[in-house]
């Protein structure tokens, strides 16, 4: 049976040519020929934003093209500071030769009619006729490495010497200097100084003047002397080249954070697990220095430091009472550990184990106990704040019978009052003219004008009474403040009434208290 011959089907291009004019082309043929398929659209739209040229994709090499591959987040570095490469064109120099080839040493024939005596002349001298012109050609070839330097040959007229002009074998090379600047955002140069108070120039010179202003509080009678005696603390002005390093908060522990967290978590699991560990708060201060004295009665060894784990041997069959009931049946007491409570206190902890039960095989069974004690806080000293100035309006009334000292003497006998008087002829006169009424007289006159008296309970509302200013013919006393300091005065305006008394011996102010406690008489 003869096999039928396979007929080649028409290609997509042939079908498109025949059916395009008639308009009977299938959609898949049109999309494939006109490149309007979904894959073609993705490539068209994606190629406008992404360029994959030169990467060597689908080449089988895997080298990344001409530039190679770089890790993510990095890129090719830029070489800064390299010497620029000067590009020089390879120009072939043009050779210029002489116009005529003439021997340098020319022999002139002798005329038969010339005399037989030959005059000897200097042949090295150059004799150029005035009518002849000398042609000199200078050639400066382009400096190359593999080119030879040709020496031009210059010829003159007849009966003249040749002049050779040799060019400089190393002519000056033309160079070009270029400058490239790269911006580094992590480095910044300050090219100007910061304008500061007291600075008169942009350089590091500071001029400090005085008398530009300010306010003086208080003062003294001689301001020139006080100004000369005052000492001012000098402060250095920062320069434009100076800087300060701000240090952060120093760490509270020397252990790294990761190790500290791991150790703290394991410590909390061992100490604060209430299902496996019994929590006991110790109040005895011996727990900090000698915890073994709380477990059993023993002698103190000053050479032994109780900073390690301690083991206590005891017979369970024998009943022994410990010094502290909380440390009953303790056979092991661990080394101290220090931690911080949520309230900020320092806690000293020791992990112990009790041996409450003993089996027939000799095994001891007991619970783990967490003994801890919180160190109390150290309160700061309460210091009384002192006032830095004298404030007006603060008045203190001192009651003499309460805060005074009494001396029991007989004023009718002047003997005890003459203590310290030297014996002299005037001593008898003093005893004779002595009068007990003179002891009650006082030359100083107190002035209470402008003062305030406050009545009432300090917890309740108080009443303030302003004492008026009086003008009487009495003696006036002056108080001079002889100490230096700051006086703070609050401006107040008071409406006082001036009263002129006709009789100066009459008391000025009489104040009566309606409350229980008696009556008091104040005389200025």
From Swiss-Prot:
Database matches in InterPro entries: Late_L2
Localization of this protein: Virion; Host nucleus; Host early endosome; Host Golgi apparatus
Keyword field: Capsid protein, Cytoplasmic inwards viral transport, Disulfide bond, DNA-binding, Host endosome, Host Golgi apparatus, Host nucleus, Host-virus interaction, Late protein, Microtubular inwards viral transport, Phosphoprotein, Viral penetration into host nucleus, Virion, Virus entry into host cell
GO cellular component, one term: host cell
PTM annotation: Highly phosphorylated.
Pfam families for this protein: Late_protein_L2 (PF00513)
Keyword hit for ATP-binding: no
Annotated motif Nuclear localization signal, positions: 1-10
First-listed, main subcellular location of the protein, grouped into a coarse class: virion
GO biological process, one term: viral penetration into host nucleus
Disulfide pattern: 19-25
Gene Ontology molecular functions: DNA binding; structural molecule activity
Superkingdom of source: Viruses
HAMAP family the record matches: PPV_L2
Assembly, per entry: Interacts with major capsid protein L1. Interacts with E2; this interaction inhibits E2 transcriptional activity but not the DNA replication function E2. Interacts with host GADD45GIP1. Interacts with host HSPA8; this interaction is required for L2 nuclear translocation. Interacts with host importins KPNB2 and KPNB3. Forms a complex with importin alpha2-beta1 heterodimers via interaction with the importin alpha2 adapter. Interacts with host DYNLT1; this interaction is essential for virus intracellular transport during entry.
Family recorded in the similarity comment: Belongs to the papillomaviridae L2 protein family.
Function, as annotated: Minor protein of the capsid that localizes along the inner surface of the virion, within the central cavities beneath the L1 pentamers. Plays a role in capsid stabilization through interaction with the major capsid protein L1. Once the virion enters the host cell, L2 escorts the genomic DNA into the nucleus by promoting escape from the endosomal compartments and traffic through the host Golgi network.
Protein name: Minor capsid protein L2
Provenance organism: Human papillomavirus 17
